[in-house]
Design a protein with these regions (language model features):
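Short, conserved catalytic/metal-binding motifs centered on acidic residues
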Residues: 1, 67, 211
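Short, hydrophobic/amphipathic alpha-helical patches that form generic packing surfaces
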Residues: 105, 109, 163-171, 325-329, ...
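Phosphate/adenylate-binding glycine loop and adjacent helical scaffold
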Residues: 79-104, 111, 121
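A generic structural signal for beta-strand entry/edge sites
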Residues: 58, 68, 201-203
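Charged low-complexity "KEKE/polyampholyte" interaction tracts
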Residues: 7-65, 74-83, 224-225, 230-367
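Short, surface-exposed secondary-structure boundary micro-motifs
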Residues: 72-76, 218-219
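Catalytic core of the SET domain in histone-lysine N-methyltransferases
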Residues: 13-53, 111-221, 265
Length: 367
């Protein structure tokens, strides 16, 4: 375990107890319970939960699977990402006075022993090194497809800070107009079939009865954007387009790839810009309702005269398929974890966009 020493505020018995555990030689389970006791002392809720290794790496599990899990980080304990910094290798709050007395010390020890210092820094560094080691031709394809730009993402000018910034991007959540960190809850792993975070009322919460690992759906995404954004493979049920350029009916079409939070329910945006047509984040496949992607795309095309919706959808679909095939060919024979993860991401993405079958006539008629 990691112990960080700094001048900490006196008078908070929960923080004093937790720091005593960190300084001592207590078992990790005892330190975890001290962490939660201090967290509850600040107004947080953490019941029936423990941290341990699972199939997705370190995660949170119920102590008693037959009982309800309760986790809540109130607004007062959410930490804006611009309120933290990396100081001598430790994640610290810049201005402790903006939070309850003792919270900055608790947060620093929490990050050192359960988040950034436990697995966060190491896993981010390993993933970024794996991507950096890919062949130049793969880097060029990833950049063209809007998935990864080495020069912007990991230029190597300040390695520690670059890893830290990637860490923040994988941990923050948009809440009431701010990008914030949610201590303890951020340790919950992602699963597409799980419920999302409860952001109603005061703070952010996760709860319910969990037979095994506590999981939550981070957001709407697809396999490749999840992999390049978060650093792990996931068989997401939806597939969005990658960046593409093509010709349709004698006109240049620019497709902006990526997922949208409302991408499973609302048509994408299609508009004319100067001499080209811009299609923004079209959904190409959806496992639970394979007739929806083409239906939503047809509704988007209906507001732009002169488009042949089915033909353009097929062109975008084919362009994505060819791009994935190209990446897989470039990765053939390439070793390393980064190449292996990217290969799996391409295959998962190919499956995801393949969930396209027919249209929803009821939705087309009601448009």
């Amino acid at each position: 375990m990691t112990v960080l020493h700094r001048r900490h505020e006196q008078g908070n018995e929960w923080v004093e107890k937790y720091i005593a555990f960190c300084v001592g030689t207590m078992a990790p389970s005892a330190m975890w319970q001290a962490l939660l006791e201090a967290f509850r002392g600040f107004g947080g809720i953490a019941e029936n939960v423990m941290q341990r290794e699972g199939p997705f790496g370190m995660g949170l599990f119920p102590i008693d699977p037959g009982k309800t899990v309760k986790l809540r980080v109130p607004d007062a304990l959410l930490v804006p990402i611009d309120a933290v910094q990396l100081q001598e290798g430790a994640v610290v709050i810049k201005d402790p006075s903006a939070f309850p007395p003792g919270y900055a010390d608790w947060f620093m020890q929490y990050q050192a022993n359960h988040s950034w210092g436990l697995d966060g820094c190491r896993s981010i560094e390993a993933f970024e090194e794996g991507l950096k080691a890919l062949p130049d031709a793969v880097h060029q394809d990833l950049k063209r497809l809007g998935l990864y730009n080495l020069d912007n993402r990991f230029p190597g000018e300040n390695r520690e800070q670059e890893i830290f910034q990637r860490f923040l991007k994988t941990r923050f959540i948009n809440h009431k107009g701010n990008k914030v960190l949610m201590p303890v809850i951020e340790l919950v792993n992602h699963a597409p079939a799980a419920k999302g975070f409860n952001q109603g009322g005061d703070g952010i919460a996760v709860g319910g009865v969990h037979a095994d690992e506590i999981l939550v759906n981070y957001s709407v995404s697809d396999p490749l954007h999840r992999l390049l954004g978060y650093g792990f493979n996931c068989q997401e049920p939806s597939g969005f387009s990658l960046n593409l350029c093509l010709q349709h009916n004698g006109q240049q079409v620019v497709v902006q790839g990526g997922g949208r939070s409302d991408g499973l329910t609302k048509p994408c945006t299609i508009e004319r810009q100067d001499d080209k047509l811009v299609v923004v984040q079209p959904l190409l496949g959806l496992r639970r309702e394979p007739g929806l992607p083409r239906t939503l795309f047809s509704r988007a095309c209906a507001v732009v005269p002169g488009l042949r919706a089915n033909e353009l959808f097929d062109q975008i679909h084919q362009g994505n398929t060819m791009a994935l095939m190209g990446l897989l060919l470039q990765l053939e024979g390439v070793g390393g974890d980064g190449a292996a993860q990217l290969r799996q991401g391409c295959l998962d993405h190919w499956i995801a966009i393949g969930n396209d079958l027919g249209t929803r006539s009821d939705l087309l008629q009601s448009a």
